[in-house]
Design a protein with these regions (language model features):
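Conserved, mostly hydrophobic/aromatic
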Residues: 3, 90, 103, 147, ...
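Metal-dependent enolase-superfamily TIM-barrel catalytic cores that perform enediolate-based chemistry
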Residues: 116-233
């Protein structure tokens, strides 16, 4: 069997009302998706994520080769990432294709640890304390074992007050995670990230509120600073979602930068490297639970990796109604991904990622290019 075609398609929907992502100073009035489709014989694999910038013209590096030669393909994708954008959605599509051929879900191909993944509700917008407290109570009632709250107020004390209100609303028996979003910025954001003392002050204040982890409290390349913060903090330090190089992620391990490692399979590692890194992370008695914020295919790819590899207490499930719902998030899927029960999702035994794209349905949303819009 040989790879016959690779096709990249872009789609966009309008968001009305807009989604106010805590990490983006501009309201998001559209949501753009890129799908990579790989075909071999009667089989089709799909993946999504970044816009695959720079990939056009390099299809010949893969066409005509065995889709199961994944080590080779990952090396080439690593090369392309150095010269262009992040092309890991192609590797996800290849795993989906391999699963279709083998008649097995990706989570079984990777090890088959379990089909059930516990979820935490990942909120994306900053809300006033009372509104976030109400949201937290609703999420607790739905059975989520944890929720993530985003920071980014100009006055960090206001962010702390939101967490305090949520803790008072839900009590001590639901975990709160906090994402400071200081590791990277949008292209149009010129603000400076926290310094070490700000991060340490926040960590101490959040520890007093029983917060489970503080995510991305410093710039993503401050390996030593993150390690020192972890040493001094009274709560877990999390991060690593977007470092492009596998060597960067192993450098975190060398320095002991994190308690919780979160490399996203479509942002920085791909699936094969995720398997390698998860083993190292968990051997170091740390938590491996990937970041996942995007569409349903991105979520599925990370959930399959979690099911196969992660012993984490929960995995990320982007959910912050009314402006970020499964229906918006998963518009490229035939149906949105929903929890199977209170605070968990059961992955199917269907081959590959377990979904079939309805290309005809998506045609109304198709666009020529998948680059981000600044407003």
């Amino acid at each position: 069997m040989k790879i016959e075609t690779i096709e990249i398609r872009h789609y966009r929907i309008a968001l009305d009302p807009p989604f106010h992502a805590a990490w983006d100073p501009n309201p998001r009035r559209t949501f753009t998706n890129t799908i990579v489709c790989v075909r071999a014989g009667d089989y089709e694999g799909v993946g999504s994520g970044d816009a695959m910038l720079g990939f056009a013209g390099h299809e010949h590096l893969f066409i005509g080769h065995d889709p199961f030669a994944i080590e080779r393909h990952v090396r080439l994708l690593d090369n392309l990432q150095f010269h262009y954008g992040r092309c890991w959605p192609l590797e996800v599509a290849l795993w989906d294709l391999m699963g279709q051929v083998a008649g097995q879900p990706v989570w079984k191909l990777l090890g088959g640890r379990t089909s059930r993944v516990p979820l935490y509700a990942s909120c994306g917008e900053r809300k006033p304390a009372a509104a976030r407290a109400d949201s937290a109570k609703q999420l607790k009632a739905l059975g989520y074992p944890a929720l993530k709250i985003r920071f980014h107020d100009a006055d960090i004390r206001q962010d702390i007050a939101v967490v305090a209100a949520a803790r008072e609303a839900i009590g001590p028996d639901m975990h709160i995670l906090v994402d400071a979003n200081q590791g990277w910025q949008m292209p149009w954001d010129a603000s400076a990230p926290w310094d070490f003392k700000t991060a340490l002050w926040a960590a101490d204040a959040l520890a007093d509120l029983g917060v489970f982890w503080l995510e991305e409290p410093l710039h993503r390349h401050d390996y030593e600073g993150l390690a020192e913060l972890r040493r001094r903090a009274k709560l877990r330090i999390a991060g690593g979602e977007g470092n492009r190089e596998y060597a960067d992620l192993r450098r975190y391990l060398k320095h002991g930068s994190f308690d919780v490692y979160q490399p996203d399979v479509v942002w920085c590692t791909g699936v094969l490297r995720a398997r390698q890194l998860a083993g190292e992370v968990q051997a170091a008695s740390c938590i491996y639970t990937p970041h996942t914020w995007g569409d349903g295919l991105v979520l599925l790819a990370n959930l399959h990796v979690c099911a196969a590899l992660s012993t984490a207490p929960f995995a990320e499930f982007p959910y912050d109604p009314p402006n970020w719902t499964p229906e918006r998030r998963d518009f490229i899927l035939p149906a949105p991904l929903l929890p199977s029960g209170p605070g968990y999702i059961d992955l199917p035994d269907a081959p590959g990622l377990g979904v079939t794209i309805d290309w005809d349905k998506l045609e109304a949303f198709r666009i020529e290019a998948g680059t981000m819009k600044s407003n």
